[in-house]
From Swiss-Prot:
Top-rank taxon: Eukaryota
Ranges of biased composition (kind: Basic and acidic residues): 204-216
Source organism per UniProt: Drosophila melanogaster (Fruit fly)
Source taxonomy: Eukaryota, Metazoa, Ecdysozoa, Arthropoda, Hexapoda
The protein's assembly and partners: Interacts with STAT3 and ARF1.
Gene Ontology BP annotations: embryonic hemopoiesis; endocytosis; hematopoietic stem cell homeostasis; lymph gland crystal cell differentiation; positive regulation of receptor signaling pathway via JAK-STAT; regulation of antibacterial peptide production; regulation of mitochondrion organization; regulation of stem cell differentiation
Bias type Polar residues, positions: 156-170
Main location: other
Name used for this protein in its record: OCIA domain-containing protein 1
Protein task: Maintains stem cell potency. Involved in endocytic pathways that mediate signaling during hematopoiesis.
Miscellaneous comment text of the record: Marker for all hemocyte lineages during development.
UniProt key word NAD: no
Encoding gene per record: asrij
Length: 257
């Protein structure tokens, strides 16, 4: 009698059918799905598509994106609108699932609740937890050679990096910490001493000194004021009246022969 292992006609058992295979949606579930379709379009797809389309248009207009030779920014805008439509539909799936799970006597809502409670991939592992698990794996975990430790640099242990700097002689001339430089304030204070403050002078002292300087200025022969020359009055020239030579008549008239 042949064993079933040696029988070549043995076939693996068929897979279990999907729970939603040949599922008949109820009227309430169909109504909820239609509401989800409408709400996802107006609340998610339309804003996302409009935003991505405007970004594509202004990107081509400002030169950030390369437009089509014939159609310009139209292809980029259409692609942005289509991408925003699908992103909006995908982002509304969780809210639509919550609406279906709130329906009473819904087999689809019961399946969604069991999947959430039973540990689906999306519901059981959050992004933060998944990221933490990824960094704890072997390729990301630090090895002993990568971990920094200052034990090798401690003075108690003799290693090749322990440099005996304290026993070496130091030359004070080579130490430029206290060497004066152009930026040093001590050099400026040593070479440029401040002038002593002059005693204050009163108004009487200034007045007396001004008088002395004025008197010295007046006594100097080169500083005498300019004196205009005295105008000489000229006497009027008297015309000498020459008496005509000759005899006079009885009336005083003179004549010559």
């Amino acid at each position: 009698m042949d064993s079933p292992l040696n029988d070549g006609s043995h076939h693996p058992p068929p897979h279990a059918p999907h729970p939603l295979a040949d599922y008949q949606f109820s009227a309430e579930e169909v109504k909820a799905l239609r509401e989800c379709n409408t709400e996802s379009f107006f609340q998610r797809s339309l804003p996302f598509g409009t935003g991505l389309g405007l970004l594509a248009y202004f990107g081509v207009k400002n030169g950030y994106l390369q437009g089509h030779v014939k159609y310009g920014a139209v292809p980029k805008v259409v692609m942005g609108v289509i991408l925003g439509y699908f992103v909006g539909k995908f982002s509304y799936q969780q809210k639509c699932a919550e609406k279906i799970m709130r329906l009473p006597n819904s087999h689809l809502g019961e399946l969604l609740r069991q999947r959430r409670q039973g540990g689906g991939v999306i519901s059981s592992i959050t992004p933060d937890e998944n990221l933490g698990r990824a960094f704890t794996l072997a390729p990301f975990s630090p090895s002993s050679a990568d971990v920094y430790s200052d034990e090798a640099y401690q003075p108690g242990r003799s290693t090749s990096l322990n440099l005996d700097t304290e026993s070496r002689p130091t030359l004070s001339g080579l130490d430029d910490i206290y060497r004066p430089t152009l930026d040093s304030g001590s050099m400026l204070e040593a070479e440029l001493p401040l002038e002593p403050s002059k005693p204050g002078q009163s108004y009487e002292d200034l007045r007396r000194r001004n008088r002395e300087e004025y008197s010295k200025h007046q006594q100097s022969p080169y500083s005498r004021p300019y004196e205009p020359p005295v105008a000489v009055q000229q006497r009027p020239v008297e015309q000498a009246q020459s008496e005509p030579a000759g005899r006079k008549n009885q009336y005083g008239d003179s004549w010559t022969d």
